[in-house]
Amino acid sequence: MRQATGFLEFRTERQGLLDITREVAEWADAQGVREGLLTLFCRHTSASLIVQENAAPAARRDIEAYFARIAPEDAHAYEHDEEGPDDMPAHLRATLTQVQLSIPLIGGRMALGTWQGIYLFEHRRRPHRRTLALHLAGE
């Protein structure tokens, strides 16, 4: 069995979903593994990872709006507010989603469905550099 590890860095410009499918696929392809399991891990507490609809922008807008409703930016609602009104809601949104994904590689390609994409979900308003750790095991 072969293993590969690495990091991918992304610069987010704002809150919302950033499609990172292409960059992840390129990294996995460069490892030369045909059959295996790819794990992605987001090294942050105010960003997360999701697999979601990649064809309809309205679906992404609805997801972003939903999280804005269930974890609103209200400075008076949270005790933890040292970094601004978007800080604690960002932590809550990351908690409600996930910071790691496991995706099978079959025939050298990620086994995503036709309409699935991998998204980095930025929960803070201002730009950030986000780092993902990747691990690929297989043959």
Show where each model-derived region lies.
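Active-site histidine-anchored catalytic micro-motif
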Residues: 1-139
